Every structure is written in C-alpha cells, then in structure tokens.
From Swiss-Prot:
Main location: membrane
Key words, A-Z: ATP-binding, Cell membrane, Glycoprotein, Hydrolase, Membrane, Nucleotide-binding, Repeat, Transmembrane, Transmembrane helix, Transport
InterPro entries for this protein: AAA+_ATPase, ABC2_TM, ABC_trans_N, ABC_transporter-like_ATP-bd, ABC_transporter-like_CS, ABCG_dom, ABCG_PDR_1, ABCG_PDR_2
Transmembrane segments: 488-508, 520-540, 544-564, 569-589, 605-625, 629-649, 710-730, 1131-1151, 1161-1181, 1200-1220, 1240-1260, 1268-1288, 1300-1320, 1395-1415
Name of the coding gene: abcH
Provenance organism: Aspergillus fumigatus (strain ATCC MYA-4609 / CBS 101355 / FGSC A1100 / Af293)
Pfam family, one: ABC2_membrane
Regulation: The efflux inhibitor FK506 impairs the transport activity.
Region of interest (Disordered), ranges: 1-49, 760-782
List of glycosylated residues: N79, N275, N790, N798, N1265, N1338
UniProt GO MF annotations: ABC-type transporter activity; ATP binding; ATP hydrolysis activity
Membrane disposition: Multi-pass membrane protein
Protein name in the entry: ABC multidrug transporter H
Length: 1424
C-alpha cells in the first residue's frame, strides 16, 4: 500500500534538461552545485532518507542518457526595497461618504502615505541551494517571494536589483513558466476531480523532446500524472472532487498537496513556496521538505521557501536562512550559523524549541528569553538587530556572492538554460513564447477541461437545457398557430422578438460565470500553461455543441408551434440566425465580464446594455420613430440586425389580408372591398384591403436583401467581441496585485487612527526600554476573571460515519471513541485525510448527509437541544461576512450566542477581553474583507477563533486546525490560551497538524487516527510525551532523541516508518485499548447517575427571534451601506435605464401609434429587473453560503431572521431606486402631470422594486450557485414577460393560458395599472398615415355609410369627416380608454384593482423566499 505521507518531487523526466555539451555538467556531485562559502560541511541533507529518491535518480540518469540540457537559474538580489500605499490610506467608502466631494478633493491633494514593507533586502540562491525565509506575518516574507518569483505588479515602488541567473526581470518575464510561486491559497475549479485537475496541468507541460523510452506525449503525461499522484500519497483521491469551502471534496491537507503537485507540474527552475505546509500534518510537511531538498540537489533547482511553523527536521534541510522583521533583514546567512549569531546577541533558545520560532521571536518581548548579563545590552528591536548583523563577519562574507550574476559561469549557465527551455518548446511556438506546448494543444487541453467543468456541474447544465425546452413550449403555445393576416403580424413579430430576447437573457449568465473561475485562470497564466486566446477559443468550442442543441430544441418547438413559414429554406434561415445571434450575445456578455475587475461593475453594464439592445432592436420602437440622439444605438445593435433578418425571412413575398380592427369598415353589410381600407398596418396603401409582406417590411426600413448582409455583420460582431475578450483576459491580474491592504470603513477611521496612535506610543516605550508588566498582569487577571467554567463530560462511543460514493459506501470514521472532560485539552491528530475534520464535524453535529452510527453524549445523556450553540467550533476554513469589521464580527457572535439572561453590556465587555487576548486591537476597526483585499490569512484565522471564544461555549470547544497558517509565536499563543481555558475547567478538543515539541507538551490527551478514520491511540500524552513514546516503543517504533514526538507518531502510523503494520489492529489488541474502553463506560455511567453539569435552557437559539432579527438586520444593513459597488451599481442602473427609456420615448404624443409607444415604454420599465436581479443574486448566495457554512451550524440565529434581514436591508435602497427611476423617466415621456395619477404610478413603480427583488431572492434562495440562478432567471422572467399581454394581446392568447397564467401573472397587473393611470383619459389624435381612407358607394355621406359600423363593432372608432361623400377618414380610437379596452382594461377602477393585486404579489414573492429557504435548509444528522 502506498504511504500517504510521502511527498516526493517530480520524476526527472518532468525536469528534462538537454545537455548537448559535456555530460560532466550533469553529475550529482559537480562542483558548481557547491554551497555558500560559509556552508557547514558537516551538514548532511536528509533527502537521501526520502523513499522515492532512487526513482528520482533514475529519472535523472534517463535525462542524462537522453542528452537533456540542465535548466539552472540562480536568483540574486541587492538593496531590494518595496513600497506600498499605507494601509491607513485604504478607506472603504460608504453609500453617503462617497458623495462627500469636498473631503475627496482634500484627500486627493494629500499624497497617499507610503509604507516600506521590504527594506534593502539582499541575498543569493544558486542552483542546488535552498533558502528558508522566516518572519512573522506582516514582516514582508510573501512580498520577498513575489519579488523573487518576478511578480512585481501592485506595488507603488520597487527599488534595487533582482537578477535571475544573468537575466533582468524584464528578460525573465519571457520565462515565467520557469520561475513559479506556490501561493498560500488553494485556487481550483472545485467541481473537477483531482485527476482532471492534474491532467490539465501535465497536458500543458509535455516537452517537445521526450526522454528515451517514452513513446508518445500522452505516455509521458500519463507517467507524470500517475507518478505525482502516487508519490504525493493521494492516488486514492484521484476520482474525488477537489472541492472548496462550499463544495465537498478532498480534505484540506489533500487539497494543499494537489496545489503542490500542480506547481511541480510546471517543471520550473526556480520555485518559491509560500507557507506550502499549511494544513499538512507534521510528517507530510517533513516529507514535502525532503522532496524539495531532493529536487534541488538532483536537478539544480533554486528553492526559496517561507514557512510559519518549521520543525527542526525541516529547518535542518536548508542551506541558508533569511530572517525578516518589520521588512528589515535582521539575518541572512548559512542555516548552521543563524542560531549561534542570535545567541551571541544575548538571546536564549529554549530547550525543545523550534530554531525557526526562536529566530522569529527575538524581537517579540513576550517570546524572547535573554541570557543573564545581557539584560541591558541585547538588541531590543529590528533596527538594533539589523545594525548588529551589518557589523558581523557573516554579512561581509555573504556579500561576496552578490557578484554571482556577472560571473562567466553564470552567463554560460543562463545561456544553457535558454537553450534547454527552447529545446522543450513546441517548434511552432515563437522564441519568446513562455509556453511549452503549441497553441493547438493548449486549445485542446482547455476544451477538454471546459467540457469537464460543464459536465461536473450537471445541475447548471441541466437547468439551461430544461428551461430552454420549457420556455420554448410556453412561447410556442403562447404564439400558437398565428394567423397569416394582419392579426398575425404582431403575434409573429412578437414570437421572433421573443426568440432573440430569451436566448439573450440566457446569455447574460456569462457575466456571472466570468468571475467564478477567474482566480484559477490567473494562477495558470503565471504558470504559463496557456495563452488567454486558447481559453477563449475553448469556451467557444464548448459553446457550439451546447448552443446547437439548445437552439435546435428551441427553434423546432417555437417555429412550428407558431406556424411560421413552412419551407425548409425559411426554417433553416431562422435557425441559423437565432444560433448566430445567441453566439454573438454570449460573446458580448463574456467580453463585458472579461473587461471588468469586479462583478458589480460588469453586472451594471450588462443590465443597462440588455435594456438598450432590447429597446433598439426595432420591435418596441420602429426605426422611423426613434429619436436622432439615440438612433446610432440601432446601427451598433446585433439584435437589430438579427430582428431585421428574421422578419424579412418570414414576411418576404407574402400577401397579408387586413382583418378585424385593421379593416375599416367591417362587419355585417360591409362586404365590398372596393369601399374598405386597411387601418393601423404598416405599409398599407389607400383603398387596399391587404398589404404585401415587402410593403410591411419597407415601412419598418427592412428588406429581404438585408438577410445575408446582416448574417455577415453578426459574425463580424462576434469576431469583435471574441477579440475584446481575448485582450481583456490577457490583462487580468490577481487581487494581490492590486495591493493587499487593510480596509478601514469611513465611519471608523477616527477610531482606527486612535488605536494606531496608542500602538505607536507603546512601541516607542518598548524601544526606550520601558516595561509594562503591571498592565499586562492586570489584563491577565481580567481575562482569568471572565473565563467560563465547565463541569460537563463529553463522550462518544463506537462512532462510525459512512457516505455514499459512485463506487459504493465509503467509511470515513471506523468505531472511534473517546471523551473530553472539564479541564482537559485534547489533541486530535492524524495524517492529512485521516478523518480529523470529519470527526469534529460529526461530534459538533455539523453533517447534513451520510449515515452516523454510535452514541454522542453530554454527561451520559443525549445531546441537549442547545448543544450546537453551546459548543464552540472553529472550522478549518475562515468564512466571514466581508463587510463587517473585526469588532462587529465578535460582537455579533457574542450578542447572539451568549445566553439571553446575560446583559448586553456584559457581553460586549467580554468582546474587549477576547480582542486583547488575541491581539486584535490594532485590527478591530478594519473590515474582514476577502483574501487579497482585507485581512491576511493569519489575521482571519485569529478572527475565526475570536468569533467562537466570545460566545462563551458552555459545554466544550472544538477547534479544527486553529494554528494552520499562523506563525510559531501565534500558534503557541493560541494553544497557550486554550490551555488556560482548560485550566479553569473548559473542555477543549483540537485538531493540530504540525505542533512543535513545546506546543505538543501543552496537551493532556491524544486521539490519533490513521487512514480511513481508524483509531491508533487514545489516552494520556504524559510529561514530555513519555506515555505516548513508551506505547510506540513497546510495539517497535521508539522515538529517537531530539525528534519531535508529534512528527514521529504521524510518521509511524502513516509515513515511511509504518513498517507496513496495521497500527489500528495493534491498538485494538493493546491493554491501553481495553483500559480506555472500560474507563469510557465508567465515565458515561458515572456522569449519567449525577445531575447534568450543564443545565439545558431548552432554547434552540440563545436569543428570541425578534432580537435575532434586529441584530442580523443591523449587520446586513451595515454591510449594504458599506458595499458601495453594489448600491451604486443598482442606482446607476436605474438612473441610466430611466433616462434612456425616457429620452428614447421622449414626449410621446396622442396618436394611435403613440398608444403603442406608451405601452412599450412601460413595458421597457420591466427590463430594469434582469440587470438588478443578476447583480443581487450572487450577493444573496454569498450571504447564504456564509450562513450555511458557519452561522446556521452553530445555531447563531434562525433562518427566519436571516431571510428577514436580507429582505428588510434592501428596502431603503429600493425606495431610492424607485424615486430616481420615476423622476428621470415619468416626465420625460410626457405622462400626465396630475398629482393623483403621478402618485399612483410612483406607488406602483415602488411596488415593482419590491416585486422583482422578491422574485430574484426566491430564485437565489434555492439555487445551488449563482450561475444556476442566472440561468433560471430567463425562464421565470421570460414566462412573466410573455403572458403580461404585451407580446400577445389578451384576446389572442390561447385559451389554455388565457384563463389561468394570464391572471396569475404579476406583470399583467403591473402593466395594467400603469397603463390605466397614464392613458385612460387621453384624446387620441390620428396621424395622417393612421387614418383608414376610402370612398362611399353611390355618393352617400360617410356618416350614413358607416352608421351600422359606428354603432356596432366600430363603436370606438372616430369618423372625422361625417359629411364627406368620398375620402372617408376613420381613426381607430377616440380616447385612450378605447385603446385600453382592446387589451382587456375595460374601466378606470381596473387601475386601483390591479395596484392592490400587485401589492399581494409583492407579499407572495417574499413569502416564497421564506418557503424556498426553509425547503433548502437541511437538518444536521444525528447518530442512529
């Protein structure tokens, strides 16, 4: 069985280096791999211990035999300084402060303060060397790594010299795939499996020249992938999704290893590893370090590593160490001399401490220990240490290396590197291309991945196809069997318009989709996997079959149900035009997504754009009615060209007889066509009772000759949008490049500055040598006074957890048992993927699927109803509301989770205690933000711990890897605090990955798990871990002296020391197991016989629902108030759409055509919804995911409070939006200025704001992700728009729909109420072309001839010349009410009736948000 913990490097075939010159250059012991002059020759790397070292050497030998060159590149830097804009300058404006123009002008005059985050750093890493960069978070380690991996964007100023071999940074940028950085974050497409993720990486790095014995690129790729998976110990995860915070996948440690593999797959020459052991267990972390050492030795790599918690085993593998503090380089030199140097300055390294922690702690007053006699002369801060280092002989000797880039051997090696890279490249690539495989292979790889992404997110794919079929059937039945006469003109035009509209709305989801995988694509850009054009072409290639299927289903259903021209030529012309138009709209929205760095900006533009394109496509407003100031939009509108082509295909060479209201007069007694004429039909000629299709098209400025011209224009638009997407994609940059800084809300700036000044004064006191012991002791007693005492015993017995997988049931926990008593600090350990997080999830009642068997009890009794909120659980992933400050997040948790009988003031006072304890006072008034813009990973981890601690957990505290991502001092402080909690009676259970010996000694008991969730040990740890050591020694695995027992244990149960033994079986047969089982039974029975230690208050939530709602609504409202992008985009979309709508329908008149325009301007108001909904839903889903991931599971507040807060927090902005739209639109279109009518219409518009928000929220409430929601919107909105009586008037809607869906459609009542108030009292005045003009028989007067008509079917018509005997002029309507009657609005009271019904629909839409949220909310699994 493959050892899980092994993390070998790549096979050497992965690092092909052609050598056409001298084979001696490739020898492992060559002299030019020599270390620094100060290298301690007694230091022997432990890479030889690595189990896969022989395989690595075989690969190396194969490369030598194949004649591969060595690609070696050292890194040298001198006087390197980096400046950024000070964090204090990064102010997060709120909705009101952004309009404070005078303040912005004043601030713009002040030059933004700069902060030096890296100060005159220097160093040299030659091929074959490893450098360890140490420093506390914020000291500049990551910045240095970014400089040394040539990631230079996002900084205000960079000074100094960096050379890669003899290359300058500009020259090295052509080789970005060879100088790579593995960042701290794991960025993947979560729905792809591990194998699919690695397939993609390896496929794009296959060299052109293959090693001897490898038959094909595919064989090389397969060999690479299988070796990497196997060597990293995660072969068993190959078919498991990678996952993320919200998608279940591999464990956190396994995900980190996938990240490492992907980085190794680049086959680079310079590797920068940024805290790459975060989330790995101690044994796996050590194996990874050995792998890097082996790679570096065998292949001459340059490896630069920064680690926060480096055990001595890892530390000893490095050649050099560089220590940073406050950006200053306080040590750089040989690893072996770092500790002696610091000890010479007067610092003492405690016994059992990690040397790395000792080096980073020398400037921390609470961490350092001073040698007797040095109390008054040791360096107290970074400046003094830097001065001491500058005077040391180490500094002078290391400076010798800085000429390395200019040496002849380096220049030769760099030329060799260039040739080696060139040998690997596909021959069709240009010399300066950073890529490895040719463009076609890049496209192929991207296409495969694109189909995998589509297929692994089946729900999104299915909703797109299902909604298309449903919408096609609905639309086909709505426009069913449209007649071939004048009555069918409007219906057929509506059907053709809807064909474009629906597919365009569906394409809007591309904006949402554009942002979902962007961080992954940016990472791959730095890895030089593919050109952005390859990705864009792959998206198109994936689009084509999906869209062909989608459009074919839609076209077949709609075309033949509507009864459009039944000829093959006409059908396929319709089909191809719809397909091309959809391709164009997809490309357009994808380009918009690519052009913007934020989703809010893209959604604002796309929402406004869809309104503009729909309005100016020629359907709502014909070309001749468009105003000159906006008519240019028609000519740049792809939908206009498509609509022109569709109408021309349908009506060309048709004879269209006028019928019904379009024929004047008609009815009994009017059968002679000589004395009839068409009315209200475009292109009608006086005295004619029909119009030809081409006449009708000409009246719209369309022509059949335009069809294929427009087809070509549509493809030209498509090509333009694709080109824009490619250019925009190539300019994407990561969030960190924009400058990673703290964000301070405008309203807390003064508070933050006060805290900063206080900190600066404290630092000055420290530099002056003052000590604050009195204050520290006071704070200490204050903390002790507030800590919670607990008396409950928590037990679990025979716990088994099973989940269903495609290959059958999989056991993740196998008969696990244990307990945590008051005052006990328990450690839960095991290799990555052993089931530690799963066990905590099950114990904390956080699982919503799978099967749990066994018992979980408190005081020998079933878990109380309040358990989930009474037990604190710090999860591994830090999920927080990004627009909350640190203090607000802690107060929110304290107010909602501490018992209801505790006064509010006391809860908030406890928050101050935790802020001091976790040293968060300098961050308390800053926004949490997102990674890259806000708190760092380490700071977020402290906030996560704080959020749980402020809740005063009364039963126990679970912490899942609370020290991952923290530096050694922060990790020790965290565990020391947990120790303190335990000492006052709290029960604490912690999963921990890489504890130092010091850290491990703080724990009382250990539960050790092996692969498959099997128990390996449970019991006391003992002084200096002696009890655990004795147990393993007894079974043949003694812990050597000076080896961290925590690392040793993991190595024994899952690493190369396992000796193939089943340690679970060893445990089950041991006396310790029997003793622990008996003690567990005794604890349960004893606890059950006593009164419970914790009295259950019987409440599921700590606070009443009303209090929950108030607190959560306040947080949501504050969050929206600070989310300027979201609010301003909503406001800008309303103002822009309103002005656009108003000026497009400027001062509408009172003619028959103007009645239609009034209908259409109101109809266009509806289309403000898609843009706002598309922007609203991702925010709703992000909030819901935060709630689902953490707040729901800890019973912080009810889902009812959550939904209420989300709904209510939007209200103020919806009111503002309604006012703005009304003011910008109502008077510009010339609607009645009477206050009663204007007020009524404003009220309806306000109701509509609430209505569409409710619709968007109920879709989002149940949607699994934002893309799914964006694809569902067209189905819902398309149906509502179709049946509101505009596209097809009420009288012509098919009977099946007319009698139910029409009456259940809120848009119907919205349109009806607004039309009644704006049109009912209008006097209709026909324009010249709108009159039906005809002669009378036998010289009778017009009044006499039309008397029967005017008293019957034409009673609403207006005869303007009754006494005339020829040229009778009849207008279709007298008043607006006559027009409204034809669309089923028969009386004025309909306006108020419909208004009331709209209000009812508003309430019902919000009720659906509650219903669907409840339907989606799963209960936690209980043990069976």
């Amino acid at each position: 069985m493959e050892d899980q913990g092994h993390l070998p490097s790549e096979p050497r075939a992965l690092f092909d280096r052609r050598d056409d010159t001298d084979s001696t250059n490739t020898a492992l012991d060559e002299t030019d791999l020599s270390r620094t002059p100060l290298q301690d020759t007694s230091h022997t790397p432990h890479a030889e211990d690595w189990s896969l070292m022989p395989d690595l050497k075989k690969q190396h030998d194969r490369n030598v035999a194949s004649g591969f060159r060595r690609r070696e590149l050292g890194v040298t830097w001198k006087n390197l300084s980096v400046d950024v804009v000070s964090a204090d300058a990064a102010i997060n404006e709120n909705v009101l402060s952004q309009f404070n123009i005078p303040q912005h002008i004043r601030e713009s005059r002040n030059k933004a303060p700069l902060r030096t985050i890296l100060h005159e750093s220097h160093g040299c890493v030659k091929p074959g060397e490893m450098l360890l960069v140490l420093g506390r978070p914020g000291s500049g380690c990551t910045t240095l790594l970014r400089m040394l991996s040539n990631h230079r964007l996002g900084y205000k100023a960079i000074r100094g010299d960096v050379r890669f071999g003899s290359l300058t940074p500009e020259e090295a940028s052509k080789y970005r795939g060879q100088i790579v950085m593995n960042t701290e974050e794991e960025l993947f497409f979560p729905t792809l499996t591990v194998a699919q993720t690695l397939d993609f990486a390896t496929r794009l790095k296959v060299p052109f020249n293959l090693p001897d014995g490898v038959t094909s690129p595919e064989a090389f790729r397969q060999e690479t992938r299988e070796f990497l998976l196997k060597s990293m110990g995660i072969s068993h995860t190959s078919d498991t999704k990678v996952g993320n915070e919200y998608v279940r996948g591999v464990s956190g440690g396994e995900r980190k290893r996938v990240s490492i593999i992907e980085c190794l797959a680049t086959r680079g020459s310079v590797f920068c590893w940024d805290n790459s052991t975060r989330g790995l267990d101690a044994s796996t972390a050590l194996e990874w370090a050995k792998a890097v050492r082996a790679m570096t030795d065998v292949f001459g790599l340059s490896s630069i590593v920064t680690l926060y918690q480096a055990g001595n085993g890892i530390y000893d593998l490095f050649d050099k160490v560089l220590v940073l503090d406050e950006g200053k380089q306080i040590y750089y030199g040989p690893m072996s001399q770092a500790r002696p140097f610091m000890e010479e300055q007067g610092f003492v390294c405690r016994e059992g401490s990690n040397v790395a922690d000792f080096l980073t702690g020398v400037t921390v007053p609470t961490e350092r220990k001073i040698r007797p006699g040095y109390e008054n002369r040791f360096p107290r801060n970074a400046d003094e240490l830097l001065a001491a280092y500058e005077k040391s002989p180490i500094r002078a000797q290391m400076a010798i290396e800085y000429d390395y880039p200019d040496t002849e051997s380096t220049r030769e090696r760099t030329e060799e590197f260039k040739l080696g890279v060139l040998d690997e490249k596909a021959k069709r690539l240009s010399k300066n291309s950073p890529f490895t495989v040719d463009f076609l292979q890049q496209v192929k790889a991207c296409i495969i991945r694109q189909y995998q992404i589509i297929w692994t997110d089946k729900a999104t794919f299915a909703i797109k196809q299902i909604s298309t079929v449903i919408q096609a059937l609905v639309a086909g039945s709505l426009f069913y069997n449209a007649p071939d006469n004048s009555g069918g003109l409007f219906i057929k035009s509506g059907a053709l318009f809807f064909s474009l509209l629906y597919n365009s709305l569906l394409a809007m989801s591309e904006v949402t989709d554009s942002f979902s995988g962007r961080p992954v694509l940016i990472k791959h850009k730095y890895f030089a996997f593919f050109h952005p054009a390859a990705f864009c072409i792959a998206q198109i290639a994936a689009d084509i079959p999906v869209l062909l299927f989608q459009i074919s289903m839609f076209a077949v259903v709609v075309y033949f149900m509507v009864g459009l021209t039944t000829s093959a030529g006409a059908f396929f012309s319709y089909w191809i035009i719809i397909f091309v138009a959809t391709m164009v709209m997809t490309a357009l929205f994808r380009a918009i997504g690519a052009l913007f760095s934020t989703f809010d900006g893209a959604s604002k533009v796309s929402g406004f754009l869809i309104s503009a394109l729909i309005m100016y496509c020629g359907y709502l407003e014909p070309y001749h009615a468009m105003h000159p100031w906006f008519i240019w939009i028609y000519w740049i509108n792809p939908l206009a060209y498509a609509f022109d082509a569709l109408l021309s295909i349908e009506f060309h060479n048709k004879i269209i007889p006028c019928v019904g209201n379009n024929l004047v007069p008609f009815g009994p007694g009017y059968d002679d066509t000589t004395f009839q004429s068409c009315a209200g039909v475009g292109g009608a000629v006086r005295g004619m009772t029909y119009v030809t299709g081409d006449q009708y098209l000409a009246s719209l400025t369309y022509s059949y000759s335009h069809v294929w011209r427009n087809f070509g224009i549509l493809w030209a638009w498509w090509a333009l949008f694709v080109a824009v997407t490619i250019i925009a994609t190539s300019r994407w940059k990561s969030a960190a490049e924009a400058g990673n800084s703290l964000l301070i809300p405008r309203e807390t700036v003064a508070k933050h500055h006060a805290v900063v000044r206080k900190d600066e004064e404290a630092q000055l006191n420290e530099k002056a040598g003052h000590k604050g012991t009195g204050t520290d002791s006071e704070a200490q007693s204050n903390v002790d006074q507030h800590l919670v005492r607990n008396t409950s015993v928590f037990t679990w017995k025979n716990l088994t957890y099973t989940v269903k997988t495609p290959s059958g049931d999989r056991v993740l926990l196998d008969n696990v048992y244990g307990w945590v008593k008051p005052g006990m600090l328990g450690a839960l350990m095991g290799s990555s993927g052993a089931g530690k997080t799963t066990l905590l999830d099950v114990l904390a009642q956080r699982k919503t699927d799978g099967t749990i068997r066994g018992s979980i009890m408190v005081d020998g009794r079933p878990l109380p109803v309040s358990f989930q909120r009474s037990a604190g659980y710090c999860e591994q992933l830090d999920v927080h509301e990004p627009f909350a400050t640190v203090r607000e997040a802690l107060e929110f948790s304290a107010l909602l989770r501490q018992p209801r009988h505790i006064p509010r003031e006391e809860k908030l006072k406890y928050v101050d205690v935790i802020i001091d304890l976790l040293e968060l006072h300098d961050l308390e008034h800053t926004l949490i933000g997102r990674v890259g813009a806000g708190l760092s990973v380490e700071q977020r981890k402290r906030v996560t711990i704080g959020v749980e601690l402020v809740s005063k957990p009364s039963i126990l505290i679970f912490l899942d890897e609370p020290t991952s991502g923290l530096d050694g001092q922060s990790a020790f402080n965290t565990v020391r605090f947990l120790r303190k909690l335990a000492d006052v009676g709290q029960a604490v259970l912690v999963t921990i990955h890489q504890p130092s010996a010091q850290l491990f000694a703080e724990f009382d008991t250990l539960l050790l798990l092996a692969k498959g969730g099997k128990m390996v040990y449970f019991g006391d740890i003992g002084d200096n871990a002696q009890t655990v050591k004795d147990y393993f020694a007894r079974y043949g695995a003694p812990c050597p002296a000076n080896v961290n027992p925590a690392e040793h244990m993991i190595d024994v149960v899952s690493g190369h020391l396992s000796q193939g033994r089943d340690w679970n079986q060893v445990w089950l047969e041991s006396p310790e197991h029997s003793s622990a089982s008996r003690e567990l039974d005794s604890i349960i029975s004893e606890a059950a016989s006593k009164p419970p230690g914790t009295v259950d208050d019987g409440y599921e939530f700590a606070m009443p629902l009303w209090e929950q709602t108030k607190i959560v609504t306040q947080r949501m409202s504050t969050s929206l108030y600070r989310n300027c992008d979201y609010i301003m985009n909503k406001i800008a979309l309303h103002i822009g759409s309103a002005l656009f709508n108003g000026f497009s329908f400027w001062m509408i008149g009172d003619s028959v055509a103007d009645m239609q325009l009034k209908l259409f301007t109101i109809f266009n108001f509806i289309f403000v919804a898609p843009g706002v909904i598309n922007q609203l839903q991702p925010l709703f889903i992000e909030r819901r995911d935060i709630y689902d991931a953490r707040e729901k599971k800890s019973k912080m507040y009810s889902w009812v409070a959550f939904v209420t807060a989300l709904i209510v927090s939007e209200f103020p902005y919806l009111c503002v939006c309604a006012v703005l739209y009304f003011v910008c639109w109502y008077y510009t279109v010339g609607f009645p200025s009477d206050s009663d009518k204007a007020g009524a219409i404003f009220f309806i518009m306000l109701c509509y704001e609430f209505l569409y928000t409710g619709i968007g929220q109920f879709i989002a409430a149940y949607a699994p992700n934002a893309t799914f929601a964006a694809l569902t919107n067209p189905l819902i909105l398309g149906t509502l728009v179709s049946f509101c009586g505009v596209l097809v008037p009420y009288a012509q809607i098919q009977a099946f729909w007319r009698y139910w869906i029409y009456w259940l459609n809120p848009f119907n009542y919205l349109m009806g109420s607004m039309l009644v108030f704006s049109v009912f009292d209008t006097d209709v005045k026909c324009k010249e072309g709108e009159f039906a003009v005809f002669d009378t028989p036998n010289g009778t007067t017009c009044a006499d001839y039309l008397s029967t008509y005017l008293q019957g079917v034409g009673s609403r018509a207006n005869l303007v010349n009754p006494e005339a005997t020829s040229g009778c002029r009849v207008c279709q309507y007298r008043y607006g009410s006559d027009y409204l009657y034809t669309i089923n609005l028969k009386d004025y009271y309909y306006g108020w009736r419909d208004t009331a019904i709209v209000c009812i629909f508003v309430l019902s839409s919000y009720a659906l948000v509650y219903a669907l949220m409840k339907l989606r909310t799963k209960a936690s699994k209980k043990a069976e």
